[in-house]
Design a protein with these regions (language model features):
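Rossmann-like adenosine-cofactor binding region
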Residues: 39-44, 167-259, 274
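Oxidoreductase and adenylate-handling cofactor-binding alpha/beta cores
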Residues: 87-106, 155-159, 284-298, 334-342
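Phosphate-binding beta-alpha-beta segment of Rossmann-like dinucleotide-binding domains, i.e.
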Residues: 79-137, 301-303
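An N-terminal-biased, well-structured beta-alpha scaffold segment characteristic
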Residues: 1-79, 211-213, 217, 234, ...
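Rossmann-like dinucleotide-binding domain for NAD(H)/NADP(H)
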Residues: 216, 220-313, 322-324, 357, ...
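Hydrophobic/small residue at the entry helix of a nucleotide-binding pocket
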Residues: 146
Length: 387
């Protein structure tokens, strides 16, 4: 029986199902794997028995992924599972920032006791005249799971859509509308845009990527939308641009001491993925990833180990080795297997950065001394007997 510890409320209705052969436990010390959402694990003392962690969501800033990699713990996320929810909210922000909707609603609420509100509302509406999205230029930074959907939806709205993503995958390139015009530099994307929306992860080369230089390239009264990560935006630059009228509106999903005091902002409570459907999709993906790893050793959508698959574990034995990406690891592994007369039926090795993953099937079960010898190889983080 494989044991799972859940952290956080995984789904709105509380239903999380792994199926036969699994049980939920109350402490991480009892568990083989952790299913989680937003709890910060930095500084958390991870029990040695934990083999994997799956986050129901895309961002993993709350998990020390490299530290866990060195412990032989595979960290999974669920990219794209909540992308439709984020896309829909971004589209909503496009409309809200263009049509004076919030201001108009506030006027109605503030004048609720006016006996002549029908007449006065007709007079007041002149103050809330906005602009249509059709024909406006929008720049989409990042054409991954969310960005590609946003770009395609903006095409459907009749917008003039430009996209920037030097690392776009083949998968996302295939689904991107032909009407999305790709540009080669961030500056070319920003130049003349009426709207700019950001959909990239927080990394060393994306932190503060939208600052004064980029804002100054936008069209007058442009709208900036950030439903990616709060660090992508230089808050001081955005604040100044709003106060100087270079930006008409700023919409984001991150309430910070700085953003909440900016003028002309639409700020939500980190709600981009906040739908029941998105929560369920993320949980389903994370559960599927954990099950395939625990049962077969296969890795998909890991943030600290390479993708690797050998299908169902059907041989007499399957072993997985999590180790540093250094020379002669495979040679040392196969030497130990040969010494013990173990016949390797299939074998695969993949690497990603400093970490590597080797998995092999054998025609016979390996004895404990062979497994122990594998564990003693220098730079070996963990050896798993899957079957």
């Amino acid at each position: 029986m494989r044991k799972i510890k859940t952290i956080d409320d995984i789904t709105k209705d509380g239903k999380v199902e792994f199926g036969e052969g699994y049980e939920f436990v109350s402490t991480a010390e009892e568990a083989d794997a952790i299913l989680m959402r937003s709890t910060d694990l930095h500084g958390y003392e991870l029990p040695e028995g934990i083999r994997a962690i799956a986050r129901c969501g895309a961002g993993v800033n709350n998990i020390p992924v490299e530290e866990y990699a060195k412990k032989g713990v595979v960290v999974f996320n669920s990219p794209g599972a909540n992308s439709n929810a984020v896309k829909e909210l971004v589209l909503g922000m496009l409309v809200l920032s263009s049509r004076g909707v919030v201001q108009s609603m506030n006027w109605v609420r503030d004048n609720a006791d006016d006996p002549e509100i029908q007449v006065d509302a007709e007079k007041a509406k002149k103050a809330f005249v906005g602009r249509e999205l059709k024909g406006k230029r929008i720049g989409v930074i990042g054409l991954g799971n969310v960005g590609s959907k946003v770009a395609n939806a903006c095409v459907d709205l009749g917008m003039d859509v430009y996209g920037y993503d030097p690392f776009i995958s083949v998968e996302h390139a295939w689904v991107l509308s032909r009407e999305v015009q790709r540009v080669g530099t961030l500056e070319d994307l920003c130049r003349g845009c009426d709207y700019l929306t950001v959909h990239v992860p927080s990394k060393a080369d994306t932190i503060g990527m939208i600052s004064t230089e980029q804002i100054n390239l936008l069209a007058p009264d442009a709208v900036l939308i950030n439903y990616a990560r709060e660090t992508i935006i230089d808050e001081d630059a955005v604040d100044a641009a709003l106060r100087e009228g270079k930006l008409s509106w700023f919409s984001c999903d991150f309430a910070t001491p700085k953003t909440v005091k900016m003028p002309n902002t639409l700020i939500t409570t980190h709600s981009g993925a906040g739908t029941g459907e998105a929560e369920a999709n993320c949980a389903d993906m994370a559960i599927s990833e954990l099950k395939d790893y625990l049962e077969n050793g296969n890795i998909a959508h890991s943030v600290n180990y390479p993708a690797c698959s050998m299908g169902k574990a059907r041989a007499a034995s399957r072993i997985a080795c999590l180790h540093a990406n250094v020379p002669n690891m495979i040679g040392q592994i196969t030497a130990i297997l040969a010494k013990d007369n173990a016949n390797v039926q299939r074998m695969t090795n993949e690497s990603a950065g400093e970490n590597a993953y080797t998995m092999f099937d054998t025609d016979e079960h390996l004895d404990s001394s062979t497994i122990e010898a594998l564990k003693q190889i220098p730079s070996m983080y963990r050896v798993r007997v899957i079957k």
